[in-house]
Amino acid sequence: MKPKVCILDYGSGNVRSVSNLITHLGYEGVVSNQPDDITQATHLILPGVGAFGAAMKKIREKLPLELLEQEVLTDSKPFLGICAGMQVLADVGHEFGKHAGLGWIPGEVRGLDSRGEVLPHIGWNDIILQNPCPLLEGLGEVLDFYFVHSYAFAPQSGDCVKASVEYGTKFPAIIQRDNLYGVQFHPEKSQKAGQRLVMNFLPL
């Protein structure tokens, strides 16, 4: 069965660019927060830009969280969180106050210790593979992705970190726990490497 992707719509500004990428790759994608679209999808993508607390407020208001937890945590539907969509997987975020996250991957989101580097972290950076990751299959040495953020995921366990990046200090670029994947960078802005990463996600 060909993958059918639901890009979860909670008012994030980059849902259309992610949807355009899915279409460009030749797959069926729908931007939606409707239960039928979520249950009928084979894969779920949660894009995200902006602050942790604001994202969580919109997610709680606009997405059926009980259904999502059933689909993702119980039924193990493949899930990809992008940028803020990765960060909200944490237990708590500390951006403009302390805010509860989804708590799907234990950890916290804290401000980058940039050690003199300019914030926000904007631009291309090479990521460093730490553990085998199906998202990076076939990418070889081309591990250059586009980042835009000032906060980073600090997981409770380092076992979920599949790749990291250095910008002042080292922090996770890709995390994974079972069917849950998160990327701090924007694959939809990362040209061929980003396209290949999403292509690798869709057969999972």
Outline where the language-model segments fall:
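Structural signature of beta-strand start/N-cap positions in the alpha/beta core
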Residues: E28, H43, P78-L80, D144
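Cysteine-nucleophile active-site neighborhood
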Residues: G50-I122
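Short acidic low-complexity segments
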Residues: E28-Q40
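Amide-donor transfer/coupling interface in amidating biosynthetic enzymes
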Residues: L73-T74, G107-L204
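Short hydrophobic segments within beta-strands
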Residues: L8-Y10
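Extreme N-terminal starter segment of soluble prokaryotic enzymes
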Residues: K2-C6
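Short acidic/histidine-rich motifs immediately flanking catalytic phosphotransfer sites
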Residues: T39-G48
